[in-house]
């Protein structure tokens, strides 16, 4: 019997019908949504023709929520309930947020991600971001008069697992199917057409409202290979605004300001900063609530001076990304500029001097990421031909592994490994009859688990009892195209399995990532010595446990003198294990103790063979 295909009324049966997928740039200051129409990407404007949606959400006492321009109007009059720059808080705890004391919000410190207290209740950054995403989804569906099948949402390349997962959760809350999380620098490269026809190595310098990213990419016949990434997810245009704000406070000799005056003056400083991108002079002119008039002039040169250390921080990250990629500045064919903050002349000049080439900025830096995301979304929706396809090879920023016996780290996936990736490694039990295994997943470059960051723990139970070292436990790490990690463990013989999707309560700050990398490099020799000692200590403990087990069952095979000799040898080994810090001394003690028990091991083997053959004739053997 033939099967009939039944379509939804009003829907086309044409197999070539385009599926509408969008690209979303969920930014710190502004957010955008874009689609591909007539083979070209375009940012979708609202009814007033505005292409940028301010990333601002306001909560009202009556339960209503405002987002975008409507909410932006309330920044000064209702600062506690009007949330700006929420991207800075995604996947973060209170201790992770820089300059938190200057923020006008009431923060709620909870295990995991922080929350913000509003008249509508405590709100997580995920909930706030979901409001912005929901408005973008509605804008897209109204523009195309159809439902969207999904979205490619961009994130900073240096976003960690917690920040990426928080972004996906926000999209889910907004009713958006995430086709992929795409790193912002890669999206920008796609938008610039650095795809099929382009060869060479490019840098993407992305300085947005709240985040900074630098990525080094190699283009080769449609393959985007990310060689290295760097940046700071807590550095952006907001920090330039704050630096200018502090300077104005100092120049005008103002006392500590109220939340209302703080927001008012900060907005005036932001406006002056933007004017200075195209004018040599600007003025911060604002009247405070008590009638005080602030009137401070500032030149381009003065702004450059007070923000120079912020620009320098981005250049340090650029140099590190080059080192990680094994390249020099002269190896870079071009530099793509992304983000509204790259309009600042001192930023463009500094980047040009570092790389020795004029940066590419012919596309609108506010739109370029969304345009690239739209092109990737169109590809994933199946709307482009094979000739238009490209392959994206992003990387993970820090090594991933597990803690083994003795607190050592066994790295499963090294840093800068292209994703998606799956790696497996076999491990075994440490003690006889061991029926469970605790697995701690860690992230970092150090040799000891205590020096790395724990991402999660889980247990594999139900391992059949057997001798130490006999069980085979296969641990598999999988990192998907979004950079999210899952880990599974399987006992090969029985098929017993356990797994975990890594969703840390909150993620690493970029300072932590940098610190972990630096500590990994600077402590390499010290770490290797510590690892060597731990390995020998594990060997010693394994021998002590094995001999103790053997004596408990077969002590009768030894005479009193032999028993005393082994007991003395084991006591000496235990003493060295407890007190010695030189791995070579521990190794010699283990070797000596092992030789001292060789005769006992031979007697046990002979007794075991004799027992197995007892009562059998030659024909049965």
Swiss-Prot record:
InterPro entries: ATPase_NBD, Heat_shock_70_CS, HSP70_C_sf, HSP70_peptide-bd_sf, Hsp_70_fam, ISC_FeS_clus_asmbl_HscA. Coiled coil: none annotated. One of its GO terms (molecular function) is ATP hydrolysis activity. Keywords: ATP-binding, Chaperone, Nucleotide-binding. GO terms for biological process: iron-sulfur cluster assembly. Transmembrane segments: none annotated. PROSITE patterns: HSP70_1, HSP70_2, HSP70_3. It holds the Pfam family HSP70. PANTHER family: HEAT SHOCK PROTEIN 70KDA. Belongs to the heat shock protein 70 family. Chaperone involved in the maturation of iron-sulfur cluster-containing proteins. Has a low intrinsic ATPase activity which is markedly stimulated by HscB. This is Chaperone protein HscA homolog. It comes from Polynucleobacter asymbioticus (strain DSM 18221 / CIP 109841 / QLW-P1DMWA-1) (Polynucleobacter necessarius subsp. asymbioticus).
């Amino acid at each position: 019997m033939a099967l009939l295909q039944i379509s939804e009324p009003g829907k086309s049966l044409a197999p070539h019908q385009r599926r509408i997928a969008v690209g979303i740039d969920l930014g710190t200051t502004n957010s955008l949504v874009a689609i591909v129409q007539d083979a070209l990407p375009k940012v979708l404007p609202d009814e007033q023709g505005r292409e940028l949606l301010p990333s601002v959400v306001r909560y009202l006492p009556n339960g209503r929520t405002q987002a975008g321009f409507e909410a932006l109007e309330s920044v000064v009059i209702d600062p506690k309930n009007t949330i700006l720059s929420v991207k800075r808080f995604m996947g973060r705890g209170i201790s992770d947020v820089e300059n938190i004391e200057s923020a006008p919000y009431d923060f709620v410190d909870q295990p995991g991600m922080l929350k913000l207290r509003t008249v509508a209740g405590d709100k997580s950054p995920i909930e706030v971001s979901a409001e912005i995403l929901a408005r973008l989804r509605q804008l897209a569906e109204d523009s195309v008069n159809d439902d969207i099948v999904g979205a490619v949402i961009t994130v900073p390349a240096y976003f960690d697992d917690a920040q990426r997962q928080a972004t996906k959760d926000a999209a889910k809350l907004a009713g958006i199917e995430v086709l992929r999380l795409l790193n912002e620098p890669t999206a920008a490269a796609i938008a610039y057409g650095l795809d099929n026809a382009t060869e060479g190595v490019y840098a993407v310098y992305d300085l947005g409202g709240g985040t900074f990213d630098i990525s080094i990419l190699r283009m080769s016949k449609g393959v985007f290979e990310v060689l290295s990434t760097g940046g700071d997810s807590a550095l952006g245009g907001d920090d330039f605004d704050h630096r200018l704000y502090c300077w104005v406070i100092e120049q005008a000799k103002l006392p500590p300001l109220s939340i209302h005056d703080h927001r008012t003056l900060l907005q005036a400083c932001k406006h002056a900063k933007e004017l200075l991108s195209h004018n040599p002079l600007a003025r911060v002119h604002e009247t405070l609530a008590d009638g005080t008039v602030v009137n401070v002039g500032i030149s381009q040169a003065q702004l450059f001076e007070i923000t120079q250390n912020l620009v320098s921080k981005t250049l340090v990250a650029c140099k590190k990304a080059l080192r990680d990629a094994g390249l020099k500045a002269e190896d870079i064919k071009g530099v793509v500029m992304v983000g509204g903050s790259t309009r600042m002349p001192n930023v463009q000049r500094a980047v040009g001097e570092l790389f020795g080439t004029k940066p590419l900025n012919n596309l609108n830096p506010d739109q370029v990421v969304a345009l690239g995301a739209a092109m990737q979304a169109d590809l994933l929706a199946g709307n482009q031909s094979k000739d238009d396809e490209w392959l994206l090879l992003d990387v993970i920023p820090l090594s991933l592994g597990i803690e083994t016996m003795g607190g050592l780290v066994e790295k499963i996936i090294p840093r800068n490994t292209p994703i998606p990736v799956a790696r497996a490694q076999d491990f075994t039990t440490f003690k006889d009859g061991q029926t469970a295994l605790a697995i701690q997943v860690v992230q970092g470059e150090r040799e000891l688990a205590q020096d790395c960051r724990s991402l999660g723990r889980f247990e594999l139970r139900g391992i059949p009892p057997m001798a130490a070292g006999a069980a085979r436990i296969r641990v598999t790490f999988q990192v998907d195209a979004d950079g999210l990690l899952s880990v599974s463990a399987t006992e090969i013989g029985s098929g017993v399995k356990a797994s975990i999707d890594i969703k840390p309560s909150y993620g690493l700050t970029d300072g932590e990532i940098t610190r972990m990398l630096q500590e990994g490099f600077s402590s390499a020799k010290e770490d290797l010595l510590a690892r060597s000692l731990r390995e020998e200590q594990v060997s010693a403990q394994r021998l002590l446990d094995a001999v103790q087990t053997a004596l408990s069952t077969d002590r009768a095979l030894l005479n009193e003198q032999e028993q005393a000799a082994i007991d003395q040898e084991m006591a000496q080994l235990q003493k060295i294990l407890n007190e010695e810090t030189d791995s070579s001394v521990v190794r010699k003690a283990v070797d000596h103790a092992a030789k001292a028990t060789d005769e006992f091991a031979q007697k046990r083997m002979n007794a075991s063979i004799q027992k197995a053959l007892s009562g059998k004739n030659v024909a049965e053997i």
